Amino acid sequence: MQNELDPFRELEFPADLPEKKKRLARIRRIAKGTYKGLSYISPIAGTLALALVGAGIYFGYPVYENYKNTDPMFDGYVAPRNPGEIVSIAQASTVTIECVLKNDEQTLGSGWAIDLKPSSSKYKSSIITNYHVLDDCFDSKGKLSVLDEDLKKYEMVIDILDKKNDLAKISSTIDLVPLNLAPYGPSPGYWVMTYGTADGWVGSVSFGSVMNNTETEIFITANTSHGNSGGPLLDNEGNVIGTNSWGMEGEQYNGAMSLDAMCLKILKCKYNKGKYYWA
């Protein structure tokens, strides 16, 4: 049975009760429980807590719902308000990249749309992927295609290859919504989401966090599998912070190439005070 002074217990109000009176009722209820509990520690602590609780609730910030006090836009450590929105953003911008070899063997990877100019007017979208997603089909060994979520095939052409950072830019006839690039780099503990064609399953999603990072690599706890390579690594606002690139057998982390790594050949970047700024 919940204590009547439990500050996490929501009150029931008549449907026609004004919002201002609801807030005042919450203040009275929480004030009793909060002040009584903290006053055992210090009368001053109880009084200060009472003032903060009252002000927060009255002005529309219900402290008993602590999650609402943290905005993902300004805090990379918290989960997004609506993870489904982040999944939808990725879904509209991520593709499967297929390499079919002459012996009919098939390899799959992923790619994500970026706001860069395609190589010619024939193509509608620019896409980032991994170098190793494409290299089985180099030298006319096979045919590369871009596949949408319904596995419809689209033409593509390779624009830029960066073997050192295992990255590539391609253009395709598929029409995609470009993903936004994160305005800042990640830090250990940041929330992340991977999206791609894990083990051939289109639209696979996993959540995790940044374990650590270097200038060019991001180590993540989110699960990835063969086929995730080239897909986007997203933050809690749906912005790209990296490109999923490799996994560690028997370890608890996987890896992505950061946006900074794209500055070598793909992005036009400025370097200032030890940091890259991409355009």
Which residues fall in each region the model found?
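N-terminal targeting leaders characterized by basic, low-complexity, disordered sequences
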Residues: 1-27
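Flexible, gly/ser-rich surface segments that form the specificity/activation loops bordering the active-site cleft
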Residues: 177-228, 244-255
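Active-site substrate-binding loop(s) of clan PA
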Residues: 85-86, 112-113, 117, 136-138, ...
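A short, Trp-centered hydrophobic/proline-enriched beta-strand micro-motif
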Residues: 88-104, 110, 192
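Catalytic nucleophile loop of clan PA
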Residues: 112, 224-244
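C-terminal cap/linker of serine protease catalytic domains
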Residues: 8-15, 59-60, 65-76, 81-87, ...
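Catalytic-histidine neighborhood of serine endopeptidases
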Residues: 59-71, 86, 108, 115-164
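N-terminal Sec-pathway targeting helices
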Residues: 23-49
